[in-house]
Amino acid sequence: AATGFMLSNDLLIVTGALVRRVLLEKGRAIGVAYARGGHEVIARCAGEVLLSGGAINSPQLLMLSGIGPSAHLEQTGISVRHALTGVGRNLQDHLDICTLQHSTQRVTYDRTSELKTAFDYFLRGHRGPGSSNIAEAGAFVRSSLAPDDRPDIQMHFVPAMLDDHGRNRLPGDGYTAHACFLRPRSRGRILLASADPRTDARIEANYLSDPEGFDLKMMVECAKLSRELFAQPAFDAYRGAPIHPARTDLSDTELVAFI
């Protein structure tokens, strides 16, 4: 599908570039300035400027351009071109809780090295661990706290032990259940750490900060649901000792402390 627009004569893709700011003229966006190869390049538009930097880089670029909360821009040393308090606000993110369990059988991806995975991928006709997206199964669940008939929890099953996003390699074999609350009430924000476009934006997620504490209650529900899943008969032949949390009989209070 990408060839339908990427090979168009109307499209120019510039790589190795960092957009520094949106160019404004009489309150209207007329283009962007970007850095490439140590030089600043001006790209002007005939119609519109579309920002597609996502939930973090789009508000960052707007604020670097002088569009955003006045006090924050002035504090960062950026001239206010258009005061807009909502820029960078209302950040919503899905906090994920992982439940890890040891496997009594060597059927997971924990012992698969990157090199071996690459060989297996080609030697097995593009099958095997190298063809996996790791999240082998997913589900949407409606918890007992759901206000309507829509699912409010999303789950993914991973046939490997993912501790700290996989950065911490645990010994042995195991599997992981990821669960998140789909409609969090906590709100965060994106801020500038510097007026330098090369500096990463500050992300204040403010997880579990809603005044009612509902997000935390839902994370407890996520953890309990994952344990309930691993207790099903389908896991009887594989179920080893629990890893995170270390016990399967934690009370709600203990789960709150774990979270």
Walk through the language-model features, giving the residues of each:
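Conserved redox-cofactor binding core of oxidoreductases
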Residues: A1-A29, A33-G37, C98-A118, A246, ...
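Short, small-residue-rich loop/turn micro-motifs
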Residues: A17, L95, S194-D196
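Short glycine-/small-residue-rich Rossmann-like dinucleotide-binding loops
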Residues: L18, G54-A55
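Core beta-strand elements of the Rossmann-like FAD/NAD(P) dinucleotide-binding domain
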Residues: G38-G53
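Alpha-helical support elements that line or immediately flank enzyme active sites
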Residues: E48-V49, A55-P69
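Mid-to-C-terminal "cap/lid" subdomains and adjacent gly/pro-rich loops that border
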Residues: P59, P69-P171, L225-A237, P245-R247, ...
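C-terminal segments that line or cap access tunnels to active or ligand-binding sites in enzymes
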Residues: F140-S144, V158-D163, G172-G240
